[in-house]
Amino acid sequence: MGESSRKPSRYLCLTICGYRKPGMSEEDYRRYMTEVSAPMTKDLMVKYGVKRWTMVHNTTATRALMAELCDSQMTNVVDFDCFSQVVFESLEDYKRMKQDPWYKEHLFHDHENFADTKKSMMTIGWIEEFVRQGVAVDGMDN
C-alpha cells in the first residue's frame, strides 16, 4: 500500500479555548460560529487533511450543570465560551491551510467578528481515543 493509506500512530489536536467578543450574547456567538464561521471553514479544513473539527459551547446554563458533578477532585469550573478542537495528522498541512489565500482573505479577519482573540487561549497535543459511538476502541480511525 502507498504511504498515504497507512494509519498514523496518532493525531494532533489543536484546542482553542475561546471567549466571545465583548458585548456579544452567548446565543449570537454560538449562532455565528455554527451558521457563519463553520460553513465557511469546514471545506478548507478538509482540503488540508483535517480529520475532525468540533465545537463545545460552554454556556452559563451548561456551566451550572457542573454543580451536579463537582466533588473533592473536580472543583474548578472554567469560564471559556467555547472549546474548538481541530484534529489532524500533519502540522505542516495545517500551517499550509493558514497560508491559503482563501483563508487569509475570508477567515483570518472573520475571527474578530465573534471571538475575543486577545483573551482566548490555545494548546496542542496528541489525541487518544478510547470510546467512539458507544464502542470501546484502541485509537483514532483514519
Curated annotation (Swiss-Prot):
Q: Which reaction does it catalyse?
A: atrochrysone carboxylate + H(+) = atrochrysone + CO2
Would the keyword NAD be found if you checked this record's keyword annotation? no
One biological process term in Gene Ontology: secondary metabolite biosynthetic process
The EthD domain covers which part of the protein?
A: 22-117
| Tissue distribution | Specifically expressed in conidia.
The record's similarity note reads: Belongs to the tpcK family.
What is the protein's given name?
A: Decarboxylase tpcK
**Source organism of this protein record:** Aspergillus fumigatus (strain ATCC MYA-4609 / CBS 101355 / FGSC A1100 / Af293)
**Gene name linked to the record:** tpcK
